[in-house]
A protein has these predicted regions:
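Polyanion-binding surface elements
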Residues: 7-25
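Major-groove DNA-recognition helix of helix-turn-helix-type DNA-binding domains
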Residues: 23-48
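Short helix-start
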Residues: 40-62
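Short boundary/loop segments of OB/S1/cold-shock single-stranded nucleic-acid-binding domains
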Residues: 59-78
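Conserved hydrophobic positions within beta-strands
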Residues: 84-86
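Short, conserved beta-turn/loop elements at beta-strand boundaries and strand-helix junctions
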Residues: 89-95
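Short, Lys/Arg- and Gly-enriched loop/turn segments at beta-strand edges
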Residues: 95-98, 132-141
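Beta-strand/loop nucleic-acid-binding surfaces
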Residues: 106-119
Length: 141
């Protein structure tokens, strides 16, 4: 069974539109990257451009590293960082809810009202959501 899973992973391909959705950019951007040779593509029997799963994975890692170039490194053990913009802050008497739009991802964090006030968090501010969890569930799409 393990060999079948590995074989399937090797055979996984994505259309330009699927790759764009996964990378959080427009299909035109992915086409330009492909035309410039930044992402290898092949064509299926109908002429549709396809991107290999391993090529897309490698490019997404390189793209993330490129986006973080020149930024100060945070001294933290949380490695899953999502830079974005604060889109909502809901304050309660004790707790608060902060929403961040990080590319195509909407992240919601519950924290204390005191922490929100100390950090001066407000709608429109740039922020980084850092995620550290003992359990992360991954489902196949």
């Amino acid at each position: 069974m393990r060999a079948a899973c590995s074989y399937r992973a090797l055979m996984q391909t994505y259309t330009i539109g699927q790759a764009a959705r996964l990378l959080g950019v427009s299909p035109d951007t992915v086409r330009r990257w492909a035309d410039a040779g930044r992402i290898p593509t092949s064509r299926d029997e109908t002429g549709k451009r396809l991107i290999g799963g391993s090529d897309l994975a490698a490019y997404s890692v390189a793209l993330a590293a490129e986006a973080n170039e020149g930024e100060e490194t945070a001294y933290t053990t949380a490695r899953n960082a999502f830079p974005g913009i604060i889109t909502a802050v809901k304050l309660g008497d004790v707790a608060a809810q902060v929403e961040i739009q990080a590319g195509p991802h909407r992240l919601v964090s519950l924290l204390t009202r005191e922490a929100v006030e100390e950090l001066g968090l407000a709608v429109g501010m740039e922020a980084v959501a850092r995620v550290k969890a003992t359990n992360v569930h991954i489902d196949r799409a």
